[in-house]
UniProtKB/Swiss-Prot annotation:
GO terms for cellular component: 6-phosphofructokinase complex. Substrate binds at residues 126-128, 163, 170-172, 223, 244, 250-253. ATP binds at residues 12, 73-74, 103-106. It comes from Buchnera aphidicola subsp. Baizongia pistaciae (strain Bp). This is ATP-dependent 6-phosphofructokinase.
């Protein structure tokens, strides 16, 4: 019988993580469970840094960005002896179950713990929206608002100077954030990890835009595809138009979560407790067509793929 659970946030922070923690804690307390908050993700689990939470521990945090429990990247957690110490730390506090909030790297940690006999449930928290098994991840919509606001501001100055602006957006290997922001921000050109890209083809498209009378342009590009500073110099040389690159960076992770992220995080936090009390373990939470679902973590990591939104890309190209 489950009496105590732990909750942690891991990897890159995302707006709405606090709301998810709150959802876990208050749902668990309503089911007569005790909840330990674990500081700084898997690192804190290994270092035995935990605190017993009550309903007041999560008061007034639903509107706060970041994660009050802290987060960290801890690659040593992939070592079995490190995980054994983490499990021992939880067992010493009579913790029966662990809820992990984070991205696919955090999912791997939860999967490894479950395989070692310590049951876990994972909640998707990442602005990249790159986790399989869910339409949206916690933090994505807030980051999207941040990116679009930045694009709007860049457009003001780009139009004033008849400049080409390149804006680099987070997302790793997933272009969802870039694509959505490009549509909402009216970007003229989009470069995504899912679509083959050459700088020559991009310049050709930009020149075609100039021939049509475009005085300025915004190019939205997902991080890690290329060096955007070098790309800006290349475009400027080939088009004879002033070109500047802006890397939005970690500002995309900050700020108060928007309404949808607060609701999504609250629902996922509640649902995680619901399914662990039903006896499920080694599962990850998702939302499909606004309905809460759960999948096997291993299946989500190895077999499930996020479908690329080709219809959204078509929309974006039609509106260039």
């Amino acid at each position: 019988m489950i009496k105590r659970i732990g909750v942690l946030t891991s990897g890159g922070d995302a707006p709405g993580m606090n709301a998810a923690i709150r959802g876990v804690v208050r749902t668990a307390l309503s089911r007569n469970l005790e909840v330990f908050g674990i500081y700084d993700g898997y690192l804190g689990l290994y270092e035995n840094r935990m605190i017993l939470l009550d309903r007041y521990s999560v008061s007034d945090i639903i509107n706060k960005g970041g994660t009050f429990l802290g987060s960290a990247r801890f690659s040593n957690f992939f070592k079995k002896d490190i995980r054994s110490i983490a499990i021992k730390n939880m067992q010493q506090r009579n913790i029966d179950f662990l809820v992990v909030i984070g991205g696919d790297g955090s999912y791997v940690g939860a999967q490894k713990l479950t395989e070692m006999g310590f049951p876990c449930i994972s909640i998707p928290g990442t602005i990249d929206n790159d986790v399989a098994g869910t339409d949206y991840t916690i933090g994505y919509f807030t980051a999207l608002e941040t990116v679009v606001e930045a694009i709007d501001r860049l457009r003001d100055t780009s139009s004033s100077h008849q400049r080409i602006s390149i804006v680099e957006v987070m997302g790793r290997n997933c272009g969802d954030l870039t694509l959505s922001a490009a549509i909402a921000g009216g970007c003229e050109f989009i470069v995504l990890p899912e679509i083959e890209f050459t700088k020559e083809e991009l310049v050709k498209e930009i020149k075609n835009g100039i021939k049509k009378g475009k005085k300025h342009a915004i190019v939205a590009i997902t991080e890690y595809i290329c060096n955007v500073e070098k790309l800006a110099k290349y475009i400027q040389r080939e088009t004879c138009r002033e070109t500047r690159a802006t890397i939005l960076g970690h500002i995309q992770r900050g700020g108060a979560p928007v309404v949808y992220d607060r609701i999504l995080a609250s629902r996922m936090g509640e649902y995680s407790v619901d399914i662990l009390l039903q006896g499920f373990q080694g599962r990850c939470i998702g939302t499909i067509n606004e309905k809460m679902v759960h999948h096997d973590i291993s299946d989500a990591l190895k077999n499930m793929k996020r479908p690329f939104k080709f219809d959204w890309l078509k929309t974006a190209k039609q509106l260039y």
